[in-house]
């Protein structure tokens, strides 16, 4: 009877240990990709972007990877001061670099209306599990990096200026996009939670017609849908899909 009890206890301990081991591990998200189903008027492109066409107005949204952002937005090739990523920073004891923000490239080609205006601050991410994320404005990111200064002088100040200068040049601006012209820039959101697999990126109140005081009298709302998988493991290399 004692041997049976010992076997039961040892089996229970082993089972609990197995549960703990299987439950351990970190979550790693795969890059966002366009969902199969999109709203009317949307076209999924080979580069992973989605384009909405309204006659000769084209609005394209594309999720960016950290590798792409490091190539596009690293001053003088120095990834350590990239405002959109952690650059080449690897935490002690780890072999990979975490993602800092979800970043989308927004491109507009206006050959249809006298002028168009998109305010990126009016955008929003809605997740399939009902989480909602508001965009990060220049002011939000300015305060974020100011709070991360190592010091108010010296190298910390130089890196802060490099980052904010890059943000000022590359964030999508809410300027008028006049007929025959294009606009290009990034829209940034807070890091998505680990349980988020499907998202809708909404561009709201896109103004396409204005009155004589430049107040919008006609606007449209667009929704771009993206998916990603969530992997679990100790490192990105050994992570598997988490069902």
Regions found by a protein language model. Give the residues of each.
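Conserved functional micro-motifs across diverse proteins
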Residues: 24-243
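Sec-dependent bacterial lipoprotein signal peptides
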Residues: 1-24
